[in-house]
Amino acid sequence: MDKSDLVQKAKLAEQAERYDDMAASMKAVTEGGVELSNEERNLLSVAYKNVVGARRSSWRVISSIEQKTEGNEKKQQMAREYREKIEAELQEICNDVLGLLEKYLIPNASQAESKVFYLKMKGDYYRYLSEVASGDSKRTTVENSQKAYQDAFEISKKEMQPTHPIRLGLALNFSVFYYEILNTPEQACSLAKTAFDEAIAELDTLNEDSYKDSTLIMQLLRDNLTLWTSENQGDEGDAGEGEN
């Protein structure tokens, strides 16, 4: 199937909310080895975000049930085995994406914007792996995630406006990484606040095309800041961090 057919198939799959099919089509496009257009890049990102998001959500539900069944060995074992099955699926998806990033997407990225987009994606998928990892594997995935985010962050500060939705989305997810994975709320809040304040200061540079995306991410940054600040003051809040 040629590239334009695969892209069309991915769009059909998105309309039908069949994200596994959408991801398979966009994986095939990526493996063609040609740099993706912005539209193709977004299709790939949306597909895998939904595919992995479903497993992350399932994993959280089953992990919670597993903890609640302490004392009932049979139920707990069933929950554990099911969690491990979901975990294996999640790991396979993340490794798929990371493979595409390493082999095709990052090496082929000619623009700073694409490089930041893909390095952020690398940070995200190592973060998802770290959520279900333990021991040495946890340490490695956390380090890889932080390095990818940091590399993306350096480029975004040099090459992109503070109001650019990709730069803002990176700040959002990197701050969630600090809060949830490294458990460093001060760093999380500082990063999110700086990104928000810098964007506010340059609101006049907001590109009309990306106005909606940028303001939505700014809202998520502010929501997270509010939540994290209240949690650190001892209020019990539900940690429903917004992510991009």
From Swiss-Prot:
Transmembrane regions listed in the UniProt entry: none
Record-listed N-acetylmethionine modification sites: M1
Protein's GO biological process: phagocytosis, engulfment; protein localization; signal transduction
Function: Adapter protein implicated in the regulation of a large spectrum of both general and specialized signaling pathways. Binds to a large number of partners, usually by recognition of a phosphoserine or phosphothreonine motif. Binding generally results in the modulation of the activity of the binding partner.
Site residues, Interaction with phosphoserine on interacting protein: R56, R127
Family: Belongs to the 14-3-3 family.
Cytoplasm in keyword set: yes
Principal subcellular localization: cytoplasm
Entry keyword annotation includes Transmembrane helix: no
Alphabetic keyword roster: Acetylation, Cytoplasm
Domain of life where this protein originates: Eukaryota
InterPro entries according to UniProt: 14-3-3, 14-3-3_CS, 14-3-3_dom_sf, 14-3-3_domain
Signal peptide region: none
Location in or out of the cell: Cytoplasm
Binding partners and assembly: Homodimer, and heterodimer with other family members.
CDD domains: 14-3-3_beta_zeta
Protein name: 14-3-3 protein beta/alpha-A
Gene Ontology, cellular component aspect: cytoplasm
Pfam families assigned to the protein according to its UniProt record, in alphabetical order: 14-3-3
